[in-house]
């Protein structure tokens, strides 16, 4: 028979129940589990007739159907259930004329070119059917708060293990219904007093660990990677056998809450919502854009699920006979109606949900960051074992693709350089700062805080960066700040760290937890990389200056004398770091020029032998490279002040390559200098055969190469020694060379672009924030109770289940990355023409000036005049001026 789902068919399930889709990634955990007979994904509970059904919700739907395409002539046949014939009277039952088949779901929009438009259509009441459903009356909490329980699809209910379904509080709908709340208030007003509540608090559960995932517009692969990693970490905690804490006072999973905060409906990827709907945390068609005309600020969904979707779209289900099954996870999904930025998302987390749940520890993750095995438990243990620990972070490393430490993404030098940066930061910077007690930045992508430690002034100062509070805060708000403070909040996590350590009367400290690891995706192209580092560099510089200027507040804290001594040492270290960063532009140029002059100019110090191209060619090549260096340095200012990185991609790629080639040349010169210093017997080189005193004198002589050797030893030796001591040296072999070649670009391109765009603080909303597609909720007075009620559509379970099939197909469909269109806008073309015009004008005039005034021109052999200095410059100028007159 023809398929009722055009364009995407369902597979028959073999009677042996050992079907598995073709693997997409051989190293995926779900794929390995599917290869074993006793795995959590091939159990007897995959059979819809072998598992006890949820009481009162008899259904033929389970999650054992395959949604990956197959024989178009076949669809799964399910038994006919008379329960759904006329549950609400005539006109509301199953009108399917084919007994034995489920009610046809809506057309599958997965092959639609615009998933957002398909999502908008699904929000309409009664989408996918021409039937009229019965309605139910829902009371508003305290007459103003709309909070409704919706039945979840039977397949999701049936996936819950019996031991959890049977161990519920009386009358609980935790596993059978999803709870939706339309929050029409500010996060600060999301309180019990105003009628808002959350399920863990309603069930009187203590929340020990609140895991928050902040999201902007990441695709479903990145989101699933993070969420599945969190589910695996919850399993690690629940499976602890000898824990003195987690196994007391109730099941461990009831002490953990996972909170997803999505920053706006418009920017979010609608395929990601399908993934959340597949595990039961979201449903289409239930959100309300306003309640009695009062705009909804955030849509809050709550459900406890045992399902998970991996990064390669494999559905993970539990098995009663397997200890590796995922335990239930209490989920809170907060979908903000408008894009209000990350700080506002954290205000929902801490001020709204945190105050109701009152967790002990909050772990912050960005969508796309995957926590490693037992990483979240390692973070929590650090807090459990240290009562004065206020914040902590783990090791973040770059995502390198298949192959682990030798992943194929390392072929991209930009990724390799970032990988080296992350590794060295985790080996040298973080442990050093952790020993002082103050880690200058706990990355927002992977960090943890003790909730009561950040309450009060730390969060108060942190939330000054929330532009939704700008009117309330006045001059202290983001709109009243000067440009320096606005940039400071681009690195808001640094502000929170400083305020936490400097909290008056407290002695909280920060720490780095080596055992906790996470991987994150990094930019792979120059435009994205430059844009990311603009925010990082400007924010970190402003935040560092803020911390140094307000260091005196440390004296009001409760730290002891030893801690204060080390904090002073760290302050001096930070001052030196800021100064070195400030003068790094000149430092790189001076290093390049001095090394070229030392090795490339024939002189008595090098036995009148220039290296590497001989006495004639080497000075010429060095001069060309030096002028190219300065020219491209000037070009960076022109590009940064007038162009977007995406509009000048080619120019930036050429700049990266040129600075890399010059750096390679300088490295060769420095190596030659070191070798020559120990092998020649020139008086200006290092003396190795006349005793220690002469060796020291020659090594540190003003004309000797000792300082170069020290710099090289500090660069090469320190990194190698520290990496091997850390037992993690692989980045030295796979990424060190790329990092060395890109070091000048990090200064000459990134810092110039960042400081040239200091005015760009990127505040304000992105996108159009369209929520007009959502229906409104209008209250009516109930004739009997005289209270405000809302009439809500009451769908039969059969229709919920049939529509769920299309949702799962969309969620588990192979991910196809969107094609990036690099079409330049008209404004980009105008800016590029302006850049070329200005660059041509400046460089042509500079070339003329250099040709007349510089003695370096003689090296090219264009003139044999014996004159030097002003005399030759005057003669050249007059010679040029004569034909003009």
Curated annotation (Swiss-Prot):
Biased composition (Basic and acidic residues): 23-34
Transmembrane segments: 565-585, 620-640, 650-670, 707-727, 735-755, 837-857
Catalyses which reaction(s): [(1->4)-N-acetyl-beta-D-glucosaminyl](n) + UDP-N-acetyl-alpha-D-glucosamine = [(1->4)-N-acetyl-beta-D-glucosaminyl](n+1) + UDP + H(+)
Record's keyword annotation contains Transferase: yes
Compartments where found: Cell membrane
Keywords recorded for this protein, A-Z: Cell membrane, Cell wall biogenesis/degradation, Glycosyltransferase, Membrane, Transferase, Transmembrane, Transmembrane helix
Effect of gene knockout: Results in significantly reduced chitin synthase activities but does not obviously affect cell morphology, growth rates, chitin contents, or virulence. If it does not affect virulence when solely disrupted, the virulence is drastically reduced in a mouse model of acute infection in a doucble CHS2-CHS3 disruptant. Leads to increased expression of the other chitin synthase genes for compensation.
UniProt keyword annotation of Glycosyltransferase present: yes
pH dependence: Optimum pH is 6.0 to 10.0.
GO cellular component, one term: cell septum
Uppermost EC category: transferase
Region (Disordered): 1-59
Recorded topology in the membrane: Multi-pass membrane protein
Listed Polar residues bias regions: 36-45
GO BP term (any one): chitin biosynthetic process
Catalytic temperature dependence: Optimum temperature is 25 degrees Celsius to 50 degrees Celsius.
CDD domains tied to this protein: Chitin_synth_C
Database matches in InterPro entries: Chitin_synth, Chitin_synth_fun, Chitin_synth_N, Glyco_trans_2-like, Nucleotide-diphossugar_trans
Domain of life per record: Eukaryota
EC number: 2.4.1.16
Induction: Highly expressed under stress conditions, such as the shift of cells to temperatures commensurate with infection, or to conditions that induce cellular morphogenesis in this fungus. The promoter contains a negative regulatory element between -1600 and -780 bp.
Family in the record: Belongs to the chitin synthase family. Class III subfamily.
PANTHER family documented for this protein: CHITIN SYNTHASE (PTHR22914), CHITIN SYNTHASE B (PTHR22914:SF11)
Name of this chain's protein: Chitin synthase 3
Species of provenance: Exophiala dermatitidis (Black yeast-like fungus)
Gene: CHS3
